[in-house]
Regions:
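Charged, low-complexity intrinsically disordered terminal segments
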Residues: 1-206
Length: 206
C-alpha cells in the first residue's frame, strides 16, 4: 500500500519524517516499523522507552540476527517513564537485547540506528511519540555515518550500567511490578506534564 512516508527520492540519503496525532502509527513511525521488519542490527538511545508489543518483537528479532542495544536513562525528570521502560526489560533481555542505563546525568537524547540508517530528531520511542505527538525526525542512510554513530553509542554505554537479567529478576518485587505496570499505562495515555506530577517516588530516577 502506498504511503508518502515510505516513498521518496531514492537518490537522496536524507528524508524528513513527520509524526502527529493518528489512529495508527504516525508517518515517521511507519518508516521505523518498515526498517525494523528486516533489520539485522538495532542501536538506540531513548529518553523515554515504552513502545507496544509489535515494536518490541521487531527489536528482539534484530537481536537474534546481528544484535540490538538500548541505552536508556537511569535518571529522569519524569520517574514514571523510567519505571515504564523497566517493565519491558525482562522480555527483551530474555531474547538477547542488550540494555544499559546511562549513569552520568539525565538522558534526553533520541537516536536510533537501524542497519545503515540513522534517525535523529524529537521523537522518543514510546506510545505518545509513535501515535500522538507532533514529531520531526531526519533519516540519514549512510553506512559510514551509521558506523560512526554506533561507535558514539558504544562510548556512551561505557559510562553506563549494563542490566544483568539475573539481577533484574531478583530486584523485581510485587510492589515494583505494580508500580511499573501502572507507570506504563499512564505514560501511554497521559501527557508528560501530568505523569511528572503522578510520579511514584523513586530515588534512582531523580
Amino acid at each position: 500500500q502506498w504511503h508518502p512516508a515510505l516513498h521518496h527520492d531514492m537518490a537522496s540519503p536524507f528524508r524528513w519524517l513527520i509524526g502527529g496525532p493518528t489512529r495508527r502509527l504516525s508517518p515517521w513511525a511507519q518508516v521505523v516499523k518498515h526498517d525494523l521488519e528486516r533489520a539485522r542490527r538495532v542501536d538506540m538511545i531513548a529518553a523515554y522507552f515504552s513502545p507496544g508489543r509489535g515494536m518490541l518483537k521487531r527489536i528482539a528479532r534484530a537481536a537474534k540476527r546481528e544484535g540490538a542495544r538500548l541505552l536508556l536513562p537511569a535518571k529522569s525528570d519524569n520517574g514514571a517513564t523510567v519505571a515504564a521502560a523497566r517493565l519491558l526489560y525482562g522480555p527483551l533481555l530474555r531474547r538477547g537485547v542488550e540494555i544499559a542505563e546511562y549513569q552520568p546525568c539525565k538522558l534526553h537524547m533520541k537516536l536510533l540506528v537501524i542497519d545503515d540508517a540513522v534517525f535523529v530528531g524529537s521523537a522518543n520511542f514510546d506510545m505518545r511519540s509513535l501515535f500522538l505527538n507532533l514529531e520531526v525526525m531526519l533519516r540519514i542512510e549512510d553506512a559510514d555515518f551509521a558506523r560512526d554513530v554506533r561507535g558514539f553509542i558504544a562510548r556512551e554505554i561505557e559510562e553506563s550500567r549494563i542490566i544483568d537479567f539475573a539481577e533484574y529478576r531478583k530486584s523485581r518485587s510485587l510492589l515494583t511490578l505494580v508500580q511499573q505496570a501502572i507507570s506504563y499505562l499512564l505514560v501511554g495515555v497521559l501527557d508528560y506534564t501530568v505523569t511528572r506530577r503522578l510520579n511514584f517516588r523513586n530515588p534512582d530516577a531523580d
